[in-house]
């Protein structure tokens, strides 16, 4: 399982995960990334999303229609910047991940998890077993 110590985070990773920051749209690692695999919490290594639920949303950040496991996600009311939004945090590491909105694909439940690339690490499908995520392989065989 991939894990990262909070002290080893780069400036953007720290800003996003620990200070509730947001990385620039269209200038982040995974906004236009559609390789088969999973996205794990940058700090805890817990699986959060899969490429199977990722979709193009034109917002500039990775977007997913649902989380891999609801128990790994915490949703909180966010009233910053004069808006009311739903913040998404990881349960285990308490990392700020992004926000969830009700404007996702209707056929997939209508949600759009808008996630900062700096908060997650991508694990390619081919490396799932090797890196300790082999139990997720059946998720891709549906």
From Swiss-Prot:
Its EC number(s): 1.8.4.12
GO molecular function, one term: peptide-methionine (R)-S-oxide reductase activity
Entries under Gene3D superfamilies matching the protein: Peptide methionine sulfoxide reductase
Catalytic reaction(s) noted: L-methionyl-[protein] + [thioredoxin]-disulfide + H2O = L-methionyl-(R)-S-oxide-[protein] + [thioredoxin]-dithiol
Catalytic residues as annotated in Swiss-Prot or TrEMBL: 114
An individual GO BP term: response to oxidative stress
Domain called MsrB: residue spans: 2-125
GO cellular component terms, semicolon-separated: cytoplasm
Highest taxon, organism lineage: Bacteria
Keywords associated with the record: Oxidoreductase
Similarity field: Belongs to the MsrB Met sulfoxide reductase family.
NCBIfam families attached to this UniProt entry: peptide-methionine (R)-S-oxide reductase MsrB (TIGR00357)
Name of the protein this chain belongs to: Peptide methionine sulfoxide reductase MsrB
């Amino acid at each position: 399982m991939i894990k990262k110590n909070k002290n080893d985070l780069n400036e953007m990773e720290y800003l996003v995960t620990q200070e509730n920051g947001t990385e620039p749209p269209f200038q982040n690692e995974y906004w236009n990334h559609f390789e088969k695999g999973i996205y794990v919490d940058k700090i805890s290594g817990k699986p959060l999303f899969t490429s199977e639920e990722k979709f193009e949303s034109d917002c500039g950040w990775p977007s997913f229609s649902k989380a891999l496991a609801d128990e790994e996600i915490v949703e909180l009311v966010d009233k910053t910047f004069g808006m009311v939004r739903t913040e998404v945090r990881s349960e285990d590491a308490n990392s700020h991940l992004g926000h969830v909105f009700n404007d996702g694909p209707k056929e997939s439940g209508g949600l759009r998890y808008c996630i900062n690339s700096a908060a997650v690490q991508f694990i390619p499908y081919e490396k799932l077993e090797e890196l300790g995520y082999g139990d997720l392989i059946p998720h891709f065989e549906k």
